[in-house]
Amino acid sequence: MALITDTNRAPAIAPQPKGIIDPNTGRPIGADDPTFLSISDELADRGFLLTTTDELINWARTGSLMWMTFGLACCAVEMMQMSMPRYDCERFGFAPRGSPRQSDVMIVAGTLTNKMAPALRKVYDQMPEPRYVISMGSCANGGGYYHYSYSVVRGCDRVVPVDIYVPGCPPTAEALLYGVLLLQKKIRRTGTIER
């Protein structure tokens, strides 16, 4: 019995991955990341990788960030959309958790009032170290539309330290996902002992 093959057909070639395009460079995010370039060069030269414990922990941490929502207003809808199948933030290692004790990242989305500020700080204090905060939307960043109201905190950075600011009213799910990727890049850049 002979194997029948078509020798006239060209071999199948997988398409190039596109990824999310960086609006500043027009290239996929991470395409010019020195971390990935050095890894591919080292693998090509030696066939194995050498690293420090710090770099290994940072690599593992960026691929397994657990986030907790602190949705206060309309921005929370866009935050939910980021978890849906169209954007699927879990493919970047960014999975939701229901408890602050299991979370690495808190996303503050919406208007933070003076009455809610102590609760935000309490939830932040319950998160294990290292902990990160993403401020999402104009209201969380600086008070937004309600900036001059007597009952609104003019930015959640007055209550908790913020690592990434995502602008917009409300910001799109793509903008939040870009903020998550920037947070992962920031974690790779910084040490594990000191933030």
From Swiss-Prot:
- Quick check: keyword Cell membrane in the entry? yes
Keywords recorded for this protein, A-Z? 4Fe-4S, Cell inner membrane, Cell membrane, Iron, Iron-sulfur, Membrane, Metal-binding, NAD, Quinone, Translocase, Transport, Ubiquinone
User: What PROSITE patterns does the annotation carry?
Assistant: COMPLEX1_20K
Task: Identify which cofactors the protein needs according to its UniProt entry.
Answer: [4Fe-4S] cluster
Bilayer topology annotation: Peripheral membrane protein
Residues annotated as binding [4Fe-4S] cluster are C74, C75, C139, C169
Q: Does the keyword NAD apply?
A: yes
- Pfam families given for it? Oxidored_q6
Write out the annotated subcellular location. Answer: Cell inner membrane
How, per the record, is the cofactor bound? Binds 1 [4Fe-4S] cluster.
**Reactions accelerated catalytically:** a quinone + NADH + 5 H(+)(in) = a quinol + NAD(+) + 4 H(+)(out)
| Molecular-function GO term, any one | NADH dehydrogenase (ubiquinone) activity
Spell out the GO cellular component terms annotated for this protein, sorted alphabetically and separated by semicolons.
plasma membrane; respiratory chain complex I
Q: Name one GO biological process term.
A: electron transport coupled proton transport
Give the residue range of the signal peptide: none
Task: Report the EC code(s) recorded for this entry.
Answer: 7.1.1.-
Catalytic class of the enzyme = translocase
Q: Which HAMAP family match?
A: NDH1_NuoB
Function as written in the Swiss-Prot or TrEMBL entry: NDH-1 shuttles electrons from NADH, via FMN and iron-sulfur (Fe-S) centers, to quinones in the respiratory chain. The immediate electron acceptor for the enzyme in this species is believed to be ubiquinone. Couples the redox reaction to proton translocation (for every two electrons transferred, four hydrogen ions are translocated across the cytoplasmic membrane), and thus conserves the redox energy in a proton gradient.
Q: NCBIfam families from the entry?
A: nuoB_fam (TIGR01957), PRK06411.1 (NF005012)
Note the subunit structure: NDH-1 is composed of 14 different subunits. Subunits NuoB, C, D, E, F, and G constitute the peripheral sector of the complex.
Which family is this sequence assigned to?
A: Belongs to the complex I 20 kDa subunit family.
- What this protein is called in its record is NADH-quinone oxidoreductase subunit B
